[in-house]
């Protein structure tokens, strides 16, 4: 198993390898870090990091799966633990009976699916390890609808390149959102989970749906998913870096492990 303590150094190594001797190892320098041009170069390096990850790793490889006896007795809930908007509170009160997942954007057949409809579709159950960027990990069991199945049903456009997840929670001005490319969107372990450890997904863990993209770090596993949007360009969303934490604190967009 990959020790969570070596995840970030491995990814930083890949970034360094991709950008060669360009001097980006000086990223810790405050003067450079405040430079817009330097930050632009860093973002270019991140794109190369993503390419390096894809070349080195088998893009279809599965994340390790575990037995029930290996499940963590406590699975920490972090980030938003609830959502206080009137709409979400009403959905919780009626157990999401009137809630609908919207799937739109670059698709030919936009969908609006109830939780009952999602649960009636073919599902996948997996026991996997959640690795948080903060340094902790936990093993849990998830069941949900494969994202690839939903995208196929919606008629994904051949021009689409990314999938954006719009969430009910927010931190400050902007709502939480995340995104993945189509390789991860169609990975067999990428699901929209509606069950955790054999029980209905709890609010604190992102009810009604939580993205599970098992080969990426925890901040990519968006909670409270309300809408799935197919797009050809991440630059049109908020600050343009493909996710809330990517926009706010320059987390890597591709958080592969």
Each language-model region and where it sits:
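Structured, non-membrane catalytic/scaffold regions adjacent to prosthetic-group chemistry
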Residues: 32-257
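N-terminal secretory signal peptides
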Residues: 1-8, 12, 19-27
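Generic, well-ordered alpha-helical scaffold segments in large soluble proteins
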Residues: 16, 20, 150-153
């Amino acid at each position: 198993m990959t020790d969570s303590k070596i995840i970030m150094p491995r990814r930083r190594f890949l970034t360094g390898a991709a950008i060669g001797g360009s001097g980006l190892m000086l990223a810790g320098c405050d003067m450079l870090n405040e430079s817009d041009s330097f930050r632009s170069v860093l973002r270019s390096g991140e794109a190369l990091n993503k390419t390096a990850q894809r070349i080195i790793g088998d893009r279809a490889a599965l994340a390790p799966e575990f037995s029930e006896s290996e499940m963590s007795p406590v699975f920490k809930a972090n980030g938003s633990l609830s959502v206080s908007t009137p709409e979400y509170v009403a959905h919780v009160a009626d157990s999401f009976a009137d809630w609908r997942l919207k799937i739109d954007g670059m698709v030919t057949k936009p969908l609006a699916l109830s939780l009952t409809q999602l649960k009636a579709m073919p599902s996948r159950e997996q026991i996997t390890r959640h690795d948080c960027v903060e340094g902790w990990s936990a093993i849990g069991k998830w069941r949900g609808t494969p994202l690839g199945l939903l995208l196929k049903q919606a008629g994904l456009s051949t021009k689409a390149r990314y999938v954006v997840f719009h969430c009910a929670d927010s931190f400050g001005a902007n709502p939480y959102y995340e995104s993945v490319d189509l390789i991860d969107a169609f990975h067999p372990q990428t699901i929209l989970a509606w069950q955790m450890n054999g029980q209905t997904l709890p609010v604190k863990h992102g009810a009604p749906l939580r993205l599970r993209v098992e080969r990426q770090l925890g901040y990519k596993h968006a909670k409270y998913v309300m809408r799935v949007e197919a797009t050809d360009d991440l630059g049109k969303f908020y600050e343009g870096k493909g996710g809330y934490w990517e926009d706010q604190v320059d987390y890597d967009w591709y958080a592969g492990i």
